[in-house]
Every structure is written in structure tokens, then in C-alpha cells.
Amino acid sequence: MNVAAKYRMASLYVGDLHADVTEDLLFRKFSTVGPVLSIRICRDQVTRRSLGYAYVNFLQLADAQKALDTMNFDIIKGKSIRLMWSQRDAYLRRSGIGNVFIKNLDKSIDNKTLYEHFSAFGKILSSKVMSDDQGSKGYAFVHFQNQSAADRAIEEMNGKLLKGCKVFVGRFKNRKDREAELRSKASEFTNVYIKNFGGDMDDERLKDVFSKYGKTLSVKVMTDSSGKSKGFGFVSFDSHEAAKKAVEEMNGRDINGQLIFVGRAQKKVERQAELKQMFEQLKRERIRGCQGVKLYIKNLDDTIDDEKLRNEFSSFGSISRVKVMQEEGQSKGFGLICFSSPEDATKAMTEMNGRILGSKPLSIALAQRH
């Protein structure tokens, strides 16, 4: 092993540092366990303020191990520091091997408590409870040295009670895997969301409307405290084919003078994840040089032209281009809107998808680049 590699192995990451912690203070603390070669607090390039983490390089690997064993979660300037081996192997960090995701954590569980609960299953490379100014966000990550330790932790801890909360413990999924899972759910849905049908609808009538597309497992019109319809509801089919056919044939259909919206039903967490995924894609489009963020608008009423479409969407932000596609002077029923920022496009899509414009409910998606 060459000298540089040896010193890399004796390097520790020090996280969750107080903004006032200095290199001198860290040197005095860590040199009590053995000779320290160097310490670097990472700082903002412009303001030179601490970013809250540092790297400590020891002369001896054994001293780095001793510091990790005896100083992890020590208090410096009122904050508990978090130590782990400095991991310069990008593949190991990103591969997901040995990485575990934990959610539904009690707010009182901190980094130290998390480490204590999971270190019994194997050597931990890193662990962190995610938090903001209000404290714990209720989820965390633990990265084990190998997958077998991670599998033991999942088998033993998933569904167990920690501080009164039943926690979920599972394999960490990277963004590509999460996006693939979302696409799979979207392509195999069986639950349908219906809105805009007014206050006269009930469960039986809604079932009569949708049962012709396939066997229904449940039908529910949402009601207020007086039992009156809130104008939206859900139908659960026993097959994806039936649900898909219902969406295709009923979206935009007139029921008792009301143009209804019919689409895939999503849980709140799925909607949030899908919106977050779309927002990240929008940002990537901008980074790749797109002059704007394009939304594809379908199911346009024949009376909607460029000006009317712009007027309907202008409240969401700066629009650089609007185009309703036409053939021989007649609308083809779809168009494009180019916003100047991902934030504006995301807001427009969230607010306007399914909204009645003219006589039809809009269908909005991110315009794909080819």
C-alpha cells in the first residue's frame, strides 16, 4: 500500500459541526487520541463560512478507529458531532449496497440513538437522521459496510416499535429505481379518481356509470357532514384494463350537464413523489440548455386559441411561448406552453391539470424532448 492510500484510510468525516467550530479546536480534540496529520473544515467559497463538516487525517489507522469508537456523538459547542470514515469511493456511496432506509421514526430519535440501535447488525460506514430547523423529519439512512449486515437489520427491525412508533426499514432505492417504481405503478393502476360531477351524485349512481367498464371492488362518493356529495369520488376496479378503459372513455364526458374529470387515483405520497420527480426533470432540462420549460396541454376546447391559453396560465409565472396546434385554421385540441422556470411550470401543472377550460377538462404533462 502506498503512503497516500494509507493516509486516506486513516481519514474521518466529522459532520453536524457548529458554525463557530475552528480547525484549532478540532485539532486539540482529536490529537488526544493520536498524531493528526491535517484537519480541513469545508467552507463556502465566497463567504468562507463553515458548511458544517470537516475531514480529519490521522497518522495511524488505529488512532482514527479509536476516535471513531470513543468520540462519535461527542458535544462540541452544544452540538453532537457525527463521525464516520471518509468515503471517497463514489461507486460504494451511490450503488446502494449496504444502504438502508428507515422511516416513521419518533421525533426524539437522534443520530446517536439511531447508531446504537443499528450498530448491533454490523459495521456502520455512516448513519444520519434527516432533520431541519424544526428537528427530525422522521426518516434516516444507515449505510453498512456490507449487504449482509443491511439484510439482517431489515429482517430484525422492519415493523418493530422504536419509542412507540412502528418503523419501516428497507433497502435504500436510488432515484432511478424510485422513478421506475412510480412508472410501474402508473402503468398498472386499478383505482380511478372522478371529480366535477356536482352535488347530486351518490355511490349507487356512480357505480351504475362505471360498472360497465369492468367489475368494481368499491365505489365511494365523498360527502360532507350533511351527507351531500362534495363533487368527487373514487372507483376501484379489479383489473387495470377496466380502470384504463374507464379513464379513456369517461374523462371529459358529460354527466347531467357536468363535464367530469376521470384519472388515475393517487395517494398523497405518490402525488408528491411524482411532482418532485417532475420538478427535478424540469431542472435538468434547464441545466441542459432548454430556453424554457414546456408543458403539453391536451383536450383543449375548440374555442381556445393562443391568446386565451396564455391568459389562463399567465398567473403562474413568466411565459415565453404559447402555441395551440392547428390544421387548416382549426384547433387540433392540443398545444404547448413554455414557462421560464421549473417552479412556475410545476405550479401551473398542479393547479390546472383537470381544470375545466371552455367545455373540457385539461390534461397536462411535461413535454418530452427528443
Curated annotation (Swiss-Prot):
List the Pfam families hit by this protein, alphabetically: RRM_1
Q: Name one GO cellular component term.
A: cytosol
PROSITE patterns recorded? RRM
SMART domains membership: RRM, RRM_1
Q: Give the signal peptide as a residue range, or say none if absent.
A: none
Q: Which CDD domains match?
A: RRM1_I_PABPs, RRM2_I_PABPs, RRM3_I_PABPs, RRM4_I_PABPs
NCBIfam families according to UniProt:
PABP-1234
What PANTHER family does the record tag this protein with?
A: RNA BINDING PROTEIN (PTHR24012)
Function of the molecule: May bind RNA.
What is the name of this protein? Polyadenylate-binding protein 4-like
Q: Which species does the entry assign this protein to? A: Homo sapiens
